[in-house]
Regions:
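Short, low-complexity S/T/E/D/G/P-rich linear segments that nucleate or cap local secondary structure
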Residues: 2-6
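Amide-forming acyltransferase catalytic core, primarily the GNAT-like/NAT-type
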Residues: 8-11, 15-69, 204
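Conserved donor-binding loop and adjoining core beta-sheet/short helix segment
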Residues: 37, 47-119, 232-260
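Conserved GNAT-fold acetyl-CoA-binding loop/helix
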Residues: 46-49, 200-215
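Short, glycine/charge-rich beta-strand/loop segments that flank catalytic centers
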Residues: 110-127, 138-142
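A structural signal for short, well-ordered beta-strand segments and their strand-loop junctions
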Residues: 110-116, 144, 176-181, 230
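Acyltransferase donor/substrate-recognition loop-hinge adjacent to the catalytic core
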Residues: 130-204
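Accessory, usually C-terminal, subdomains that scaffold auxiliary metal cofactors
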Residues: 209-279
Length: 279
């Protein structure tokens, strides 16, 4: 979402407040309670609002946050583009948006918000009609499933996944699923390193960045509030996954890694984790 112009009438009011600055600060592990006090009560389901993702990817986006008039607000850099997220909270959304637009103006940047969903678009159009342009990018869309679907895999659409799981069970009847605990972090790191070697992570910017975020998350697993699980075959790790709640009714699965030589490992770790995600 971008503003069409920096000259629309609301700036007459904003200019009167131009000496005020939003107190943005870097997102750190110490900010977990503050940030989740807003996100857990929200209806927003964007994976960008996961505290783990905010911290783990800060190296790439320089993510900052602030609390403004009962709203949680974020700003970050997507390459050379300064961007904001839709404010999270309750109250006068229009006033907070004006403050963000003014913040962008002081940065000599066009106001841009990323991660805006269709329901948020309706809110923006109602608050500031005709002032924004909207561009859809499905490459950044989140996939949302019902937990009951992934934990039961009933129906024709999950037939392929059931087949993978059945083959896994038949081939490895003595497999074990265990939660990720501090003493098991290293074996997750070892599998990730092997996966990256096979997939040449360090030769690709995208997978290289993902690796850096994943390693940070594993090293700060408990501080981030993560939950995860591991699959073992013959006492050897073959898959792991982890994530955390995004809000009061949505859980974000942030990572799934598996040994590609073990058929069905990806499907199995997804199924087992779906059956154990905390309520």
């Amino acid at each position: 979402v971008k503003t069409k112009s920096l000259d629309f009438p609301l700036y007459k009011e904003l200019n009167a407040k131009s000496n005020l600055m939003i107190p943005f600060k870097d997102v750190t592990l110490a900010d977990r309670d503050t940030i989740t006090s807003f996100t857990m009560k929200s209806d927003r389901r964007n994976c960008d609002l996961s505290f783990s993702n905010l911290c783990s990817w800060r190296f790439l986006y320089d993510t900052q946050f602030a609390v403004v008039d009962n709203f949680l607000v974020f700003k970050f850099w997507a390459g050379e583009q300064l961007a904001y997220m839709m404010p999270v909270g309750t109250g006068d959304l229009k006033a907070v948006l004006w403050e963000l637009i003014e913040d962008a103006r002081k940065e000599n940047q066009h106001f841009c918000m990323l991660g805006v969903c269709s329901n948020m678009r309706a809110d923006l159009e109602a608050i500031l009609p005709g002032q924004f342009t909207f561009t859809e990018d499905r490459d950044y869309a989140d996939y949302i499933y019902l937990r009951s679907d992934l934990s039961t895999l009933k129906g024709k659409k999950f037939q392929a996944k059931r087949n993978h799981i059945n083959r896994f069970r038949n081939t490895y009847p003595d497999y074990e699923y265990t939660p990720i605990t501090p003493d098991r972090i290293q074996e997750c790191l070892d599998l990730e390193a092997e996966w990256c070697k096979v997939n040449h992570c360090d030769q690709q910017e995208g997978t290289g960045n993902e690796r850096r975020a994943l390693i940070y998350a594993l090293h700060n697993f408990d501080a981030l509030g993560l939950t995860g699980g591991i699959l073992h075959v013959n006492s050897k790790i073959v898959a792991f996954t982890f994530g955390m709640p995004i809000n009061h009714e949505t859980f974000g699965v942030h990572v799934e890694k598996a040994d590609t030589n073990i058929e069905g490992a990806y499907a199995m770790i997804n199924y087992e984790f779906a059956n154990r995600i905390p309520e």
